[in-house]
């Protein structure tokens, strides 16, 4: 397990650097003479027509609805594996990261709502600081290499996966638009087909892919966010075949490099470009960016630490062997790296609002995530033993 985690983190570390480059490139283009080209490129209409089916969306929405569905497929595969065989497969293992993740979602959301109380438009962004970017958080931790105990890596991985599960539930419940009955019926039929494949022990990924594509289109047309199709597909793919092989893990390993080196950087490039030219100091200090930034920087670590501490004191959970509160605290700070996940929720929360709110949300996410990453990295570096000690 330690080797698998090391391989995973080494890939995430490189991906984290690529994400930073993508964000920097997006900000550079959005604040340069190329800003018009940048916005025009993302607004390019892309049409796919097959018979009566007609999908017609700007490139930005193809990225957010299509590529991110593959990312959520990967998240679903990771969640299923951890629930059945990994760090969340027993109550003892799952209890502490579960309480930590709940606190890490509730407190940041509360801080955001405190700053945006009374404004029904901006209140829609309450879930933005509740998210943790698993790839970026693990990538920052990976920079410290072998100094980080395996138990601490597993704790962050488990916490981030539960956080992702919470985000999936939030999207399903709070960020779905008017529902189409016909599309939901088609989606339900596709889900029944996927479950039947699983129950029959079908291990070939091709049938899951065909039904999964039908499900994605139906969910896209239904008013439920299309990324949830990826999670449903993941939960239907068998973890273990009769011969001991794992179709689920095979797909997970195949998707990881695509997610790390293509999907997330492309998403970051498409969503992180915020034009700063028309923003005053008053705008930067407005409730949306401040609520998000403080929710990530302060709300995340406070929520994670508070709920973890109470759970341990009430004997509902226990600290991992060899890990103390001084190691948990900087990891709690790293959970404030919302980055791509927070930006994704922002794109849903303010989809129908003035584009300015989306820009402010992305700016708050960038500020909060960068500070959380710096605080978490240097704090953890300080409390961990030096190399060779």
UniProtKB/Swiss-Prot annotation:
List where this protein forms a coiled coil. none
Q: Tell me what reaction this enzyme catalyses.
A: Na(+)(in) + 2 H(+)(out) = Na(+)(out) + 2 H(+)(in)
InterPro entries membership: Na/H_antiporter_dom_sf, NhaA
Query: What topology in the membrane does the UniProt record assign?
Result: Multi-pass membrane protein
**Localization terms from the record:** Cell inner membrane
* TM annotation in the entry: 17-37, 59-79, 95-115, 124-144, 154-174, 177-197, 213-233, 261-281, 292-312, 328-348, 363-383
Identify the Gene3D superfamilies for this entry: Na+/H+ antiporter like domain
**Per the similarity annotation, which family is this?**
Belongs to the NhaA Na(+)/H(+) (TC 2.A.33) antiporter family.
Protein purpose: Na(+)/H(+) antiporter that extrudes sodium in exchange for external protons.
Name of this protein: Na(+)/H(+) antiporter NhaA
Q: What is the lineage of its organism?
A: Bacteria, Pseudomonadati, Pseudomonadota, Gammaproteobacteria, Alteromonadales
Gene coding for it: nhaA
């Amino acid at each position: 397990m330690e080797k698998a985690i090391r391989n995973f983190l080494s890939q995430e570390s490189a991906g984290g650097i690529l994400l930073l480059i993508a964000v920097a490139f997006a900000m550079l283009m959005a604040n340069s003479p190329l800003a018009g080209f940048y916005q025009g490129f993302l607004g390019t209409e892309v049409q796919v027509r097959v018979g009566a089916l007609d999908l017609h969306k700007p490139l930005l929405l193809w990225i957010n609805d299509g590529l991110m569905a593959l990312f959520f497929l990967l998240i679903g595969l990771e969640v299923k594996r951890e629930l059945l065989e990994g760090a969340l497969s027993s109550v003892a293992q799952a209890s502490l990261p579960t309480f930590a993740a709940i606190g890490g979602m509730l407190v940041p959301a509360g801080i955001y709502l405190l700053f945006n109380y009374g404004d029904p438009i901006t209140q829609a962004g309450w879930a933005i600081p509740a998210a943790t970017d698993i790839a970026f958080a693990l990538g920052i931790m990976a920079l410290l290499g072998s100094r980080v105990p395996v138990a601490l890596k597993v704790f962050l991985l488990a916490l981030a996966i539960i956080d992702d599960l919470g985000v999936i539930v939030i999207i399903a419940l709070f960020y779905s638009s008017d529902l189409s009955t016909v599309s939901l019926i088609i989606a339900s039929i596709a889900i029944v087909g996927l479950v039947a494949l699983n129950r029959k022990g079908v291990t070939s990924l091709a049938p899951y892919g065909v039904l999964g594509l039908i499900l994605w289109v139906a969910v896209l047309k239904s008013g439920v966010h299309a990324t949830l199709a990826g999670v449903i597909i993941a939960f239907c793919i068998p973890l273990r075949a009769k011969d001991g092989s794992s179709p689920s893990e095979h797909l997970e390993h195949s998707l990881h490099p695509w997610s790390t080196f293509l999907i997330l950087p492309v998403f970051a490039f498409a969503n992180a470009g915020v034009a700063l030219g028309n923003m005053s100091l008053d705008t930067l200090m407005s409730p949306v960016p401040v609520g998000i930034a403080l929710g990530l920087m302060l709300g995340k670590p406070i929520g994670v630490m508070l709920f973890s501490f109470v759970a341990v004191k009430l004997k509902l959970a226990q600290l991992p062997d060899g890990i103390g509160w001084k190691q948990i605290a900087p990891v709690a700070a790293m959970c404030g790296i919302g980055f791509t996940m927070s930006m994704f929720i922002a794109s849903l929360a303010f989809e129908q609002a003035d584009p300015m709110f989306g820009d402010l949300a992305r700016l708050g996410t960038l500020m909060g995530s960068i500070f959380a990453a710096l605080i978490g990295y240097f704090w953890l570096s300080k409390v961990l033993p030096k190399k060779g000690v």
